[in-house]
Amino acid sequence: MALLDVDKARNLSNKDLVADIQPYVDADSDFDKDDYLQVFWNQGYDTNGKLFAFPAYGTTQIMYYNIKAFKDAGINADDIRTWQDLEAAAKKIREKNPDMAGWEPMWGKWNMVDAVLSNGGKVFSDDGKTVTINSKEWVEVWESFRKWIHDDKIMKIHSGGQGWEYWYKTIDDVLADKAGGYTGSSGDQADLDFTKVAAMEQPGWGSNASAPTADALQLVMLQNSSDEEKQGVYEFMKYFTSPENQANWSMNTGYVAVRNSTQKVDSFKEYTKDHPQALVPLQQASHGSILPEDPTGGKIWDALTVAADEVEIEGKSAQEALDKAQKTAQEALDAVK
């Protein structure tokens, strides 16, 4: 058994190194597949219908805001339904305190990819033959981020540094009253002071509903294991993903439970009364998107990484950066199709 992200688990499955878990599920009359959040469960299937992985827990990027900054600027977090609402809030925060960043997206492509998905954008055409990362939905979102950071100066990013240095600098700004909020991982909750910050879901874009990615961390069953070992692995998968264990995991780590009924566990219900932020990732994941597989082995994501730096750090136009990324990504896709 191993705990892996989706790309690595799928790669092992493509090499026939992990077993199909479906026969174990089919033979288990007590198994309740419908209680698993669909966005996490469905990431375990390949295109041939093989169930190559079980979701162990999930992660999704949510919004953390500085309670005092919002209050001082007269902002009600419940009123932020769109990225345009967040833009207006960031402007108010900057007007109230010119030394404070209105909002800090996390450096890199993923926050902007989430916003694109919430704008109705896609990575591929429906037939999977064309990369669509320079469509109007993409350009609109990425150009807005460029404008907010470089022209309006209502947002900022931390970039570079050693390892996760940029991530913790972003968090520190919000905790030190230097930023109105930031976009970060559900797993950040263990590092945050919720007397100073609160959590909310990512908003939609314009008239489009919120649809950020929700990623599963997966448990796989190794193909060469004995029948007895495989049965034991299946039992552990069920045990780890029981509502009670999912509740404990979520409360202690901030990561997202993969079972809907986790919300009915008494300890979790009591916990979320005092820690409402723990419910935000679970609620967001219920309408989250599955990040599509990059069939090029990562070259499409690499092209977007370069484009994100050009937009966020260098201030290049989104159209220019995404047109270049589109060309690179399409060539990579054509080479494997």
Predicted feature locations:
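Ligand-binding "clamshell"
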Residues: 12-20, 50, 99, 118, ...
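Short helix-initiation/N-cap motifs at beta->coil->alpha
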Residues: 7, 81-87, 159-172
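Hinge/lid segment of periplasmic solute-binding proteins
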Residues: 6-60, 198, 267-270
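Long, aromatic- and glycine/proline-rich binding clefts that accommodate carbohydrate-like moieties
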Residues: 251-299, 303, 310
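Glycine-centered hinge/linker elements that transmit conformational signals in sensory
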Residues: 89-91, 130-162
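Extracytoplasmic/periplasmic substrate-recognition and gating elements
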Residues: 73, 150-151, 155, 192-256
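Short helices/loops that flank or line small-molecule/ion binding pockets
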Residues: 15, 69-70, 88-95, 166-178, ...
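Conserved N-terminal structural module of periplasmic/extracytoplasmic solute-binding proteins
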Residues: 1-16, 26-31, 164, 177, ...
